[in-house]
Regions:
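Extended terminal and domain-junction accessory segments
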Residues: 2-93, 98-101, 140-146, 153-169
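Beta-strand signatures of extracellular beta-sandwich domains
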Residues: 103-105
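Extracytoplasmic beta-sandwich strand-turn segments characteristic of Greek-key/jelly-roll folds
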Residues: 76-83, 108-144
Length: 169
């Protein structure tokens, strides 16, 4: 795939000329491998306390269908709400069955990415799910409401790849 590298240049009227970044450093960045969450971890202060999940929601990502539909669990905007209760540890398993990357986002919470299936990785609100791969994340249900989870490739979300996590009594 093609990689783009951008540099931010700060210039003010009458100031010194912009300093271009070191071309060797830019070339090294452009040739680097994509970020791998298996090697990243959160600082201990940001990790969720170790605990088994109380509920697991599997979100199967698929598409595009003949009409360019992107789905979660076989539905456009999956009407089956992912039910959670206040205080639960919730695991979302994003199972990508498509040939594209999907940056999956959850509103209202941050989650702990699980690497190697169980080791606590980085703390995020969006995780990149590679083609034909699964990524599991855990979050604590501590912000009641109805929270959208969707693909951050906007055209995938608009074409149906979204669902709602709902707190129930």
């Amino acid at each position: 795939y093609k990689r783009q590298v951008r540099a931010v240049l700060s210039v003010s009227p009458g100031g010194r000329e912009a300093q271009w970044p070191d071309q060797q450093a830019v070339s090294a960045l452009a040739a680097a491998s994509p970020f791998n969450t298996a090697t990243a971890t959160a600082l201990p202060v940001f990790q969720l306390p170790a605990r088994r999940p109380d509920v697991i929601h599997r979100l199967t990502l698929a598409g595009p269908a003949a009409n360019y539909a992107w789905t979660i669990n076989g539905a456009l905007y999956d009407p089956r709400r992912g039910a959670v209760r206040q205080g639960q540890r919730v695991r979302l398993v994003f199972d990508n069955r498509s040939g594209m990357f999907h940056p999956m986002h959850l509103h209202g919470h941050t989650f702990q990415v699980l690497t190697d299936g169980s080791r606590q990785g980085p703390r995020k609100d969006t995780v990149l799910v590679p083609p034909h791969a699964s990524v599991a994340v855990d979050f604590d249900a501590d912000n009641p409401g109805q929270w959208l989870s969707h693909c951050h490739n906007v055209y995938h979300g608009e074409a149906g790849m979204m669902t709602v996590i709902s707190y129930v009594d």
